[in-house]
Amino acid sequence: MQQLEFYPIAFLILAVMLEIVANILLKMSDGFRRKWLGILSLLSVLGAFSALAQAVKGIELSVAYALWGGFGIAATVAAGWILFNQRLNYKGWIGLILLLAGMVMIKLS
């Protein structure tokens, strides 16, 4: 199993946070009707990919991408629940549990 170092993990955390911000801003932009929020969303995505590019220098691509995507989805679900009153049905919860289980399996492999 690969030993993780601080800086790649920090960049991965930054990438996840920027992805969450991008998703929230995209929702708030109302389909780019609020152009500045849409532009900020795009800049956040660019920042997230840039941070992910730095993270994969010290973390295997498959692990970094799975963690980035998985944590991003899980946190975006939580943000949608808190900020926009969006709720998952039982199929959504099953999917989220499978996603988290898959992330654990990839990390353990």
From Swiss-Prot:
GO CC terms of this entry: plasma membrane
Cell compartments where the protein resides: Cell inner membrane
Membrane topology according to the record: Multi-pass membrane protein
Transmembrane region(s): 6-26, 36-56, 64-84, 88-108
Keywords, alphabetical: Cell inner membrane, Cell membrane, Membrane, Transmembrane, Transmembrane helix, Transport
Gene Ontology MF annotations: amino-acid betaine transmembrane transporter activity; antiporter activity; choline transmembrane transporter activity; spermidine transmembrane transporter activity
Superkingdom: Bacteria
Listed InterPro entries: Small_drug/metabolite_transptr (IPR000390), Small_multidrug_res (IPR045324), Spermidine_export_MdtI (IPR023737)
GO-annotated biological processes: choline transport; glycine betaine transport; spermidine transmembrane transport
Major place of residence: membrane
PANTHER family per UniProt: SMR FAMILY PROTON-DEPENDENT DRUG EFFLUX TRANSPORTER SUGE (PTHR30561), SPERMIDINE EXPORT PROTEIN MDTI (PTHR30561:SF6)
NCBIfam families: PRK10650.1
Protein role: Catalyzes the excretion of spermidine.
Family: Belongs to the drug/metabolite transporter (DMT) superfamily. Small multidrug resistance (SMR) (TC 2.A.7.1) family. MdtI subfamily.
Binding partners and assembly: Forms a complex with MdtJ.
Protein name from the UniProt record: Spermidine export protein MdtI
